[in-house]
């Protein structure tokens, strides 16, 4: 809403009509002071009788209609969905929602008026100067008066930063605003000798990262001078990184002893600086010149723009003030405020000259020359001289690298030699010390449109411009110049999503000449490699795999068909061999036909392990021709032609590279898993193959359902590869109980309770058909009880008693049947698994020795079993080293995951405890035994929560076969399924339901809209083209939830909030809670609540101690909020954890908390922090693993994110407000009965209603009840008649489990929908959500103030979400709005 048109009232004649926008005025003259008739409470000129003079103020005290009485008409209950059959309440008193009054103190009113007045005046001034409107106007900061040049008086000069004006047609989005580049960062970079325009370009390319921008400029500068000399020598390739790091550490100690405090290691093994005192340079350039020059500049130039200094001037090149930072502001504290750890000083000691040594990650110094930079604060030293000194020093470093000698001390000595350096001072010109040459406009036919929200790509001036492919963006020249510096150097990146997204918007094509040269080199190396003994030895092993026999068939089909489906059993070699068949075939051909292959994997560990395996088979290290890329990590180089990546990484690339330019083959592995991402990728690829006839797609499945995929791609050909495995004996639960002689003890947690047995019997009776009921009654009446009695196969085992189980399992011992009859089949029995492991390790059987693979549902079960085995002397290795135990889970580090592939010493049994990650994604060769718990975590839609959740479910028959196939790789194997044979044959599904049909679709909707190819399509039309579309009702519900959250517009367009939620792989409501927690600086508590919502509540309630557990929970309660009670409990746990593990255990036991749930929440908090860091909402570079390592007890998030992100972490009212924004529209109205009164000696007193008399109603579901586990269960009075909830549970009645009271201001300021103000019976009613939520404003002024403040807040949140790097603390407009919101929520 434009601030310049907020008031439509006219100061004129009276009798105007009241409206939510103000009164309709009369025809009074604007240039006179006659008062208008006002009308119904108009704004300018006021309302009322018309006797007051018109005022130019926005609000006046006389406009305040003080209406404190509530309207007499009772509020209308919103129960439109009440079913006809619902019984009326038994009590007679009518219940109603108390209509609360929206108050605001006079002090707060004045402050809000002053704030809005300032904001609107600035907006009006900005609008009149600019003459534009819309999003561009809203997103710009507010500036002071007379900031821009008067119309027609603008000075004529070229704009500072305009290269993007030459890229693309007019509809391309406006350039990155100047606030994206800090003037302090530009000034800092320029002191290395680079011109400010080069600095600005580099900073934009590197997303404001000062260290990365410096390295980018240095490489660009040095590559033009030294070219191929910068290449890594062949000797350095084979040197280990550990050896290089050790030598650097030794040199560090030597430099510290020689240079003392002048030497500083800014970043360990990355950045060194040495302060220098070069008096001869200071004396050579007289300081008087500087003073004279600066004086002339001050006399002739306009003063510096104050908004530019703050980092954001909306007028840009039209501003009449100077966009430069004065030299006096660049020293001291201001200079150190540049937020870059690579360059910041650790203390206040400064030197006029500094030598900086920089090492990239995995740098091979001293076998490889480091980047060398000469830095000076001497403003009289010419920029060109600084660069010539840096080049001279780098040349010396290259010479030392040939002999692998340390170079830093030698460089210091060279700088102190006046005779050597003075020679360089005669060179006063350098290409990078002057502005770059203007880039010519791109011809219109080669311009390429950009997708929505795409950041502009800044071109670079390089020498490759004449070698570009047609249609390639100019920005690629810069990247290719870097790539052509030498042979393929492996780049290991921890790349954030922000940087990945920015890079993805550049074309992936490379210059034809550069690509041909690189391919020629790769072909030559491959031909040489084929002659080596090592390669031949590995090739012979590869030829033993079943996939090798189909090599010619596969290549022949690919030469004729664009899409091929390959079905192969686990272990046939399809994942490792088929990509190599394609690559090797292309390497034996001409260089211009070399393949560029991407192979997707469903999990991170798969991408890493397979890439390392394939690289080993090719007798090279990973990162050369074979690399991998996962979220936040990539190991690849310019020579990589086979890239293994996760499905999500490829989908992210598609956001900026819609047709996968430069890619020749896409291989989608494990398509049979039918994940949401893989099904969506198939839809995208089906579109791309229609556009790119040269792109080939190979789908690989480990099951025999390949026909479905073949049909989806127009009946493309299918190849079936047989598996290679030894016979595997398959056993079930009854067999496991027999061999281990396991017996359930009384009171065992794995025993079914009597209540559960009764429940199962009741369930079985309900599930019977009418015919089965008749048959059962007839059997009982005729006493048909013979030996041949049978039990129907449709009845599950858990619904049978001992006698029925005897009938079903003939030949099984009674002791086993007795155990089965009382066992809880829904639980994973860790005791039985331990007993099986003892049987296997003891070796009292005929099976050969080998590794054991145990499949468990999730990380919690893995931890429990691991700890349980550690208390068993057979497994803990305290007496003898008989076993080694490895957990395997996707959240573990790469090093921990790789340990499972290491073969143990002779006589030691390797036990791997894994989730279904080991089912198809990876192959562990030495596994002989498999224990299948029969359970897995599966994403499901939780109707109670209205969101996605991970639930324990039984595996399918296909899953069970895959798990069985993991055994028998090297010898005859054994597989124990911990479910019965009957359950396997009659209860398990043949295939799991595709994920897309059982999960909420909000995330996929957002992902579809973020892709350029689907951004303008109707969601229904896109979903209908999926291989197996979800139900239309599921899509409809997801669209409603997205609109309620503000992520999607009614016409299905993505909002800025939706854009960022699409980048967070979490439920959209949790994502919104995380974002708002970051914006309002209460991050840590917001993440704690988000982790609980995403996982589960840590409060536990044992059957025999329910009352005691509820009382303990009430001790944490305050502000009528389950979420704030959770927050208190979690804080207490963190404090106890910092004391000791024992204290943590006692705290959980005493307060009925689950320690494992709290640990899972802590892990989730760290993951959420990483995600926010990844998209730029908290400081970049935060990684969950690093946070966990640095945490000294607790989760470590508060310390990692810093005080700035948690300024309001102790403000419970603000936390509730942020929660309101995330959970809305999950609001419950509290209806209270009409008052009862009691006579007393002092008069009549109103009685509090009983808790049972309160009624709770939702907008869509009618009446609900508060769950007994909630802290609000027995509450008799709520200060506010509105509660927020997260989850509904339907049993005999509909319950809301956790809820939190929310007051007036959070609802008005953060609730969904538009705020409406209406005059009803003399009172101004503020309403939300079509009148579902209503308040009475204390006055018209209060109503309008709140409404206008809500508009400003909405706009500010949009600006922040559009630009996550915007600092609301330093932004004058943002900080004032946030402060006012916090004050109103806290004090009113």
From Swiss-Prot:
Belongs to the DEAD box helicase family. DEAH subfamily. SUPFAM superfamilies: CCCH zinc finger, P-loop containing nucleoside triphosphate hydrolases, UBA-like. Residues 79-89 have a biased composition (Basic and acidic residues). It comes from the Eukaryota. Keywords: ATP-binding, Coiled coil, Helicase, Hydrolase, Metal-binding, Nucleotide-binding, Phosphoprotein, Zinc, Zinc-finger. This is Putative ATP-dependent RNA helicase DHX57. Residues 175-220 form the UBA domain. It catalyses: ATP + H2O = ADP + phosphate + H(+). Residues 1-107, 121-154 are annotated as: Disordered. Residues 832-1012 form the Helicase C-terminal domain. ATP binds at residues 568-575. The keyword Phosphoprotein applies. Its EC number is 3.6.4.13. CDD domains: DEXHc_DHX57, RWD_DHX57, SF2_C_RHA, UBA_DHX57. Residues 1-11 have a biased composition (Basic residues). A zinc finger (C3H1-type) spans 299-326. The keyword Lipoprotein does not apply. Pfam families: DEAD, HA2_C, HA2_N, Helicase_C, OB_NTP_bind, RWD, zf-CCCH. A motif (DEVH box) lies at residues 669-672. It comes from Mus musculus. Residues 555-722 form the Helicase ATP-binding domain. The modification Phosphoserine is found at residues 128, 133, 475. Probable ATP-binding RNA helicase. Residues 34-51 have a biased composition (Gly residues).
